[in-house]
């Protein structure tokens, strides 16, 4: 990796453990659906989330629409997110050798979340899909990131939780 200058990180399931937040959001969705007489289990909903993810679709919204067309917003409980144990030491080691950035499919407020975790300053820039209006794997988000980095594709590595990202 001697010619690599930049490392682009995803956020969820890469630096931040979102397991509890996702579980709670699915539980809330299932509870809502059951309350409006839609019979669905946690396992069924989770299965649809996984299918949507594999098919490059918005996992939660796609799964919810499989069971209901109600215009209901089930909030994502970000307060249950935590950094993985190795996140801080790994970033501390890498930022001395590489320029780091976050490119993630995230809602507005990603900067604030990273500041709350104490890792915002480890990154040269943070690019959320909400900033660009498209989500990974749309090439526009990657092109925007390359322009911000002033970097050729061959001088970076992406560290993501799924290969389609």
Question: How does the language model describe each region?
Answer:
Residues 2, 6, 135-165:
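Conserved Lys-Pro-Asp/Glu-containing loop-to-beta segment of HAD-superfamily phosphomonoesterases
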Residues 2-89, 111-112:
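N-terminal helical cap/lid subdomain that shapes the substrate entry/recognition surface
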Residues 10, 102-105, 160-161:
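Short beta-strand segments
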Residues 39, 120-124, 152:
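Conserved H-loop
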Residues 45, 122-133:
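A short, structured active-site edge motif that brings together acidic residues
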Residues 54-55, 103, 134:
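Anionic, Ser/Thr-rich low-complexity intrinsically disordered regions
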Residues 69-80, 87-117, 126-129:
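Substrate-recognition element of Asp-dependent hydrolases with the DxDx(T/V) motif
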